[in-house]
Amino acid sequence: MSIVVQSAVTHFRPVMILAGGTGGHIFPGLAVAGALRARGVPVVWLGATGKMETHLVPKHGIEIQTIAVAGVRGRGMLALLGAPVRVLRAIFAAMGVLRRYRPRVVVSFGGFAAGPGGIAARFMRLPLIVHEQNRAPGMTNRVLARVAKRVLSGFPGSFVAEEVVGNPVRKDIAGLPAPGVRFSGRSGPVRLLVLGGSQGARVMNDALPVVLRVLSDSDVAVEVRHQCGEALCAETERAYAYAGVAARIEPFISDMAAAYAWADLVVCRAGASTLAELCAAGVGSVLIPFPAAVDDHQTRNAEYLVAAGAALLLQQDRALYVYLESVLRDLLSDPMRRLAMAEAARGLAKSDAAECIAEIVLEESI
């Protein structure tokens, strides 16, 4: 399947990006695609039929080719037994796409199509670059890293032989003033930003109103901005109303740079892209990793920020409410600690990641 936005006919061989399935794979790929196109390099995308990338990528003016491929984890024994045949078909389909476009280099950011696409690139002796966003690498990139020409990572410790380049973030977030400048002279209520992600995190929607109600007995005033996901807005509003806590409830925040600039502290999950944004913006955080994340990669991500003093880590378990109350009580009343965490986060930032990856791609082009 082909969704054509820009012509594949060009005087230059394109770079092919392999990424899909989740925004955590797609958005870093889009950032690097933008950096390459700014240099006049054409880009074509290989994704999986019917997945998120087929909707997102064309909106950025990038041509996408798709192959039929799906994951096998958690799909039962029949899916596992039939996997080799489906994988071989996907590899041959990917080889057909590669023959058509003859890319100068292939870059994997992970996802369903990345495995067959990367293996096909290896068979065809095309340069393969792998970028892993998480500290615990996904299955696809673990396989491809063994045959890739360059292995890049967003965090240290993903692979033994790696180049740590960071995860791409939007320029408006990377361009925010330093924490000391933003927080200087700030007065009024402490500004708490809660990010549940595009689908919403029900545990945060449930926990924050209850915890903030308990904290209302303190001397610290808190202003809350809570992004809860479209499907969970009504129940989140009811939870805050029942708790008697005033909050600005939003299904989606379009201007994340402004939200980070506003915040004194963030409570959120620990996806790689979110953590890269926290570091680029320079804001301290309380991280609650998604417990069902594959290979518990969000906990591994969070531990990196915690070790640097940029965040605190809470597990989603029965004691969450108790620990969240204790942590927020301390942080909301301690502006110097919040500033120290924000500065530690900023110290981890690699705000030029997209440009760095683009340069590496061009170095390896044939």
UniProtKB/Swiss-Prot annotation:
Subcellular location: Cell inner membrane
Recorded catalytic activity of this chain's protein: di-trans,octa-cis-undecaprenyl diphospho-N-acetyl-alpha-D-muramoyl-L-alanyl-D-glutamyl-meso-2,6-diaminopimeloyl-D-alanyl-D-alanine + UDP-N-acetyl-alpha-D-glucosamine = di-trans,octa-cis-undecaprenyl diphospho-[N-acetyl-alpha-D-glucosaminyl-(1->4)]-N-acetyl-alpha-D-muramoyl-L-alanyl-D-glutamyl-meso-2,6-diaminopimeloyl-D-alanyl-D-alanine + UDP + H(+)
Keyword field contains Translocase: no
CDD domains, per database record: GT28_MurG (cd03785)
Xref: InterPro entries: GlcNAc_MurG, Glyco_trans_28_C, GlycoTrans_28_N
Uppermost EC category: transferase
Gene Ontology, cellular component aspect: plasma membrane
Binding site for UDP-N-acetyl-alpha-D-glucosamine: T22, G23, G24, N134, R170, S198, I253, Q298
NCBIfam families according to UniProt: murG
Protein known as: UDP-N-acetylglucosamine--N-acetylmuramyl-(pentapeptide) pyrophosphoryl-undecaprenol N-acetylglucosamine transferase
Species: Xylella fastidiosa (strain M12)
Gene field: murG
